[in-house]
A protein has these predicted regions:
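S-adenosylmethionine-dependent methyltransferases
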Residues: 1-194
Length: 194
């Protein structure tokens, strides 16, 4: 991470501050060992995980007032994991996931910045058949549907990790694929309220 230009920022949720170390901008790139390339992450898409997107802010603001109780929560495609960091402040049972090889390092760094407990993290792709994440009561994510093939992959991943009464909260900026995802989830027995 030392070759990257970084940015530090604080996001406020009422009386709760979340401190973030992010990439300075969407032009950063550092993959000297080719780890991202081996996962199919191009240099153009490499920095997308490392900035806070508007959809992430919307999800975090929504989840800040959400009563998580004792629910086991999974954030998929966490990127900078703003919602996971906020839920961690609330002492929620959160696991964050992302496909990007650097996301876990930034999550660890940001959890320390916020003086919180370590956050469970798994580097996993939606097509990965062998993960041991288990089942969750609440699955959250934002701005996930970049490409057409993501619809089926995401739907199958959510179905594979959902308890029978699982709630799914996804924020989409209008990339044109949310209706297809909703249709797939309805086929799995979910209800859609979008």
């Amino acid at each position: 991470m030392t070759k990257l230009r970084l940015c530090y920022q604080t996001v406020e949720f009422g009386k709760t501050d979340i401190h973030l170390c992010t990439l300075r901008d969407k032009q950063e790139f550092d993959d000297p060992q080719g780890a991202a390339e081996k996962l199919g992450i191009s240099s153009a898409s490499w920095p997308l995980f490392g900035v806070v997107w508007p959809s992430s802010m919307v999800l975090a603001h929504y989840i800040s007032d959400y009563n998580t109780g004792t629910k086991r929560i999974l954030e998929i495609g966490c990127g900078m994991a703003l919602s996971s960091l906020l839920l961690n402040k609330k002492l929620a049972n959160i696991t964050a996931t992302d496909h990007h090889p650097e996301a876990g390092l930034f999550l660890q760094r940001n959890a320390q910045l916020n003086e919180g407990l370590p956050i469970n993290y798994a580097q996993v792709g939606w097509a990965d058949a062998h993960d041991d994440l288990g089942l969750f009561d609440l699955i959250i994510g934002s701005d996930l549907l970049y490409e057409e093939q993501h619809v089926a992959l995401l739907a199958n991943f959510i179905e594979a990790h959902s308890n029978p009464a699982c709630e799914v909260i996804l924020v989409d900026p209008g990339r044109g694929r949310k209706n297809k995802l909703s249709e797939r989830m309805i086929e799995f027995g979910f209800n859609s309220l979008h």
